[in-house]
Amino acid sequence: MPTPLALLLSAILIIGTYFAMPFWPFRKSNYDPRGKHCYITGGSSGLGKALAERLVKQGAHVTIVGRDSKKAEGVVEELKAIAAPGQIIQCIAADLTSPIASTNAIHAACKPHADQAPDYVYLCAGFSRPKLFVETTKQELKDGLDGVYWVSAYTAHEACQMMSKQRRTGKIIFVASFLSYVSFAGYSSYSPAKYALRGLSDALRSEMLLHNIDIHIFLPCGISGPGFDAENRTKPAVTKKIEEGDTPITPEVCAAALESGLKKGYYQITDNLVTEPIRLRSNGGVPTNNFLLDTLWLIVSSVGVPIWRMTADSAVRSFRAKVEKELEAKGYYVS
């Protein structure tokens, strides 16, 4: 016989579904890269490169942007080898933490396309250098914001202006992180910028309805590759302990998860079931992905997330003596 709690939850689901039906977000996705100009920041490695390969295979015209011109040119040659005749494959070398360079880069990319704004903009550029906050320099704090937030915000701003001025529909896809939802020891120079990126994306999702421009945000967990290896070189032991058991996925699997979400018309896209309870606890009132599943995940999150948080806090406390000893050896303390 069903328990009173089970009956109550069933009633909530049924009643909630009934009243939500008139506003149900049935999304028929118009995502189709074929023949579209796809502009990818951070496209010379990791997720950006894997995404570029997928898009080229689907018949898209692809522009990748990266700081290292030689590396980007090498990727372009790889992409051209799998492209069909007529596809425009190119690269732009630019430091996208500069507003001027960001503006110049996207306009240069559009020259072969009659100066028309890109159809799809994928903001994959960024980096993570985890450290304990008290050991992070002021410059590293600034670099974290520049290399995670501004590196995408400047390009998004110019893309929105280009699309709206030309009355063109399009898509802008932010690549954020699981750490845009939740943060912990070691990510004080990274998570704030990722939170800001989610805030910008949420605001634009609403505002760009005025211009019929679609905004999406991808929030993956760890992605294997050179970037992840560099991250681990500075990652504190306490951070590694909290992340113990987390296995990064390949850029190729990550890119497939991103496109799967875009094809479903999701606004917030994740690559891991573990992220779903966190997403529902922290989504800021944005559109759901699936009403019934999201309701169930929300119920799970009310138990699972507090348990995870207590476990993480316990791990941090267990490292207190070790961290104090290390800081003492470095002469950090004044007495």
UniProtKB/Swiss-Prot annotation:
Top-level taxon of origin: Eukaryota
Gene Ontology molecular function terms on file: 3-dehydrosphinganine reductase activity; NADPH binding
Alphabetical UniProt keywords: Endoplasmic reticulum, Lipid metabolism, Membrane, NADP, Nucleotide-binding, Oxidoreductase, Sphingolipid metabolism, Transmembrane, Transmembrane helix
EC id: 1.1.1.102
Residues that, per the record, bind NADP(+): 47, 95, 190, 194, 223
UniProt pathway: Lipid metabolism; sphingolipid metabolism
TM region positions: 288-308
Catalytic reaction list: sphinganine + NADP(+) = 3-oxosphinganine + NADPH + H(+)
Motif (GXSXG): 42-46
Localization: Endoplasmic reticulum membrane
The keyword Endoplasmic reticulum is assigned to this record: yes
SUPFAM superfamilies: NAD(P)-binding Rossmann-fold domains
CDD domains according to UniProt: KDSR-like_SDR_c
Active site (UniProt): 190 (proton acceptor), 194 (lowers pka of active site tyr)
Main enzyme class: oxidoreductase
GO CC terms of this entry: endoplasmic reticulum membrane
SMART domains from the UniProt entry: PKS_KR
Membrane topology: Single-pass membrane protein
Keyword Lipid metabolism belongs to the record: yes
InterPro entries, A to Z: KDSR-like, NAD(P)-bd_dom_sf, SDR_fam
A Pfam family matched in the record: adh_short
Family label: Belongs to the short-chain dehydrogenases/reductases (SDR) family.
Function: Catalyzes the reduction of 3'-oxosphinganine (3-ketodihydrosphingosine/KDS) to sphinganine (dihydrosphingosine/DHS), the second step of de novo sphingolipid biosynthesis.
Protein name: 3-ketodihydrosphingosine reductase TSC10
Species assigned in the record: Cryptococcus neoformans var. neoformans serotype D (strain B-3501A) (Filobasidiella neoformans)
Annotated gene: TSC10
